[in-house]
Amino acid sequence: CSVSAPERTADRNFASEDPEPLYKEDTWYADFTSNNTIYEKFPFSLWRKTMREVLSEYDLELVQRAHFLGVPALRKAIADYLYRSRGMNVSPECIVIGASIEYLYEKLIKLLPENSVYGAENPGYRKIPRIYEEFGLPWKSIEMDESGVSMASLRESSANIVHVSPEHHYPLGTVTTAGRRQELLSWAAEAADRYIIEDDYDCEFRYSTKSIPALQSMDLNHRVIYMNTFSKSLAPAIRISYMVLPRKLMEHYIARANFYSNSASSCEQYALARFIENGSFERHLSRLKKYYRQEGERLLRIIKQSSLIPSSRIT
């Protein structure tokens, strides 16, 4: 059927109107979100140099579909870095690269035992329970104490998978003690369907004490799944995260997920591999740690000089 000219004109006029946005960004006077970085401290000149090197040395690799586990050069660079920085002796073959922790979590959930109950730290990073809720997974809150995740709370729950952040808990800042880490590993070894998801986010930024080796490095029973991201150590816009799977889970992943395309940019993966290999990444971390330490000390001085906040327990 035909449409009359007046109706067409009305349709065009309607289409030309600006629709209301479906989502509006909030505007804040001060931003205290915990996952931000100091964008001005991003190593722009070094990153540009690295990108130019990658663009000049690689051709088809940058535009072809990447390996579904991630670019091999980056997986090897990450494995070497984890050995130096976290005491982890892992094979690049057990590392999976993805564009975000959320993406990797989606893949991980499909590998874990069916009918699993997930445990999340309370208080803790709210995004983790939201992921469980998004997939309709049962989860329990696991209380914290001064040593880390409460073993009593964990045992009282029906959880067989627990998500922990032993190196730097958010928001309490607790560092899980070596003894509690051993207790967690013993708990995981007691049943075949138990796993620990170690979220090592922010592990690079320890100022007053020496880092404890990663929980994964202490695991003799292959029950720890290690996850981390470069969003805090570099920038949120560099969408590269990774997980280290126990070999048994990795075999399942290869068998079941090899048809997936890798979600991270190949060009950025090659650039990050080079950035880690030539030492630029660790030098950048050293500069960031110095800056954050100084800023933290300055903030504490200001708080202690102020009468607005009791300072007797601030450290």
Predicted regions and their residues:
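Conserved core segment of the aminotransferase class I/II
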Residues: 47, 220-290
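Conserved core of the PLP fold type I
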Residues: 51-54, 61-192, 203-204, 210-218, ...
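Conserved acidic functional residues
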Residues: 1, 198-202
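N-terminal basic, amphipathic alpha-helical segments
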Residues: 1-52, 258-265, 273-276, 282-294, ...
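Short histidine/acidic/glycine/proline-rich micro-motifs that form metal-
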Residues: 36-39, 168-171, 202-205, 259
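Short Gly/Ser/Thr- and Asp/Glu-enriched loop/turn motifs at secondary-structure junctions
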Residues: 91-92, 313-315
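A generic "structured core" feature
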Residues: 122-132, 159, 195, 255, ...
